Amino acid sequence: MVWTALDFETTGTVKGWPNEPWQLGLVKIEDGVVLPETKWETLLHVGDRPFSPRAVGRYAELREELAAAPAITDVWPEIVQRLCGTPLIAHNCATERTMLTKLAPMTVFGPWIDTLAYARGRYPGLPSYALGDLVESFGLKDEVERMCPGRTWHDALYDACACALLASRFMSEGVA
């Protein structure tokens, strides 16, 4: 079975402005194995607008690239092709689910696997269920860094790969 792990980075909520995605990253998992050759990402043009001070990520470094990035409508056919027809995996999938529903309210995506909810249920009592902390706890950080050299947390591709590796770990236990 093929799964798709994804992550959006968004502008965050700013009064008078919608929360918009500015980066999408994804990677496929087949039969429990993460397929690095399927990594895909895009920056998304959001126009000249403020970002929430609470929005984390590399957007400040990428202002020029974001200004030249395609609008989501330009890459939407490719996004749909990459996401439809596979179960979707995200860490705290509410953000990804909300973004996709907002962008295409008549399109059904999923089913969804939430690695955050899964980890909370399977491993009660951990000090933190943040993606980075879980990746560290399960000894996956080096593998994430090999897949996404020069990247770090709150980069959509890095986070999607981290989520995929975490999901793969859960699948290898025979419990996901």
Language-model features: locations:
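Conserved non-catalytic scaffold segment of RNase H-like nuclease domains
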Residues: M1-G110, G125, D133-L140, C148-G150
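Generic detector of well-ordered alpha-helical packing
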Residues: F8-T10, R97, T115, A156, ...
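Short helix-capping/linker segments at secondary-structure and domain boundaries
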Residues: T107, Y123-L126, F170-A176
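S-adenosyl-L-methionine-dependent methyltransferase catalytic core, i.e., the SAM/SAH-binding region
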Residues: Y129
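Acidic two-metal-ion nuclease catalytic site recognized across multiple nuclease folds
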Residues: V135, L157, C161-A176
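A short glycine-threonine-serine/GTX helix/turn-capping micro-motif
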Residues: C148-Y158
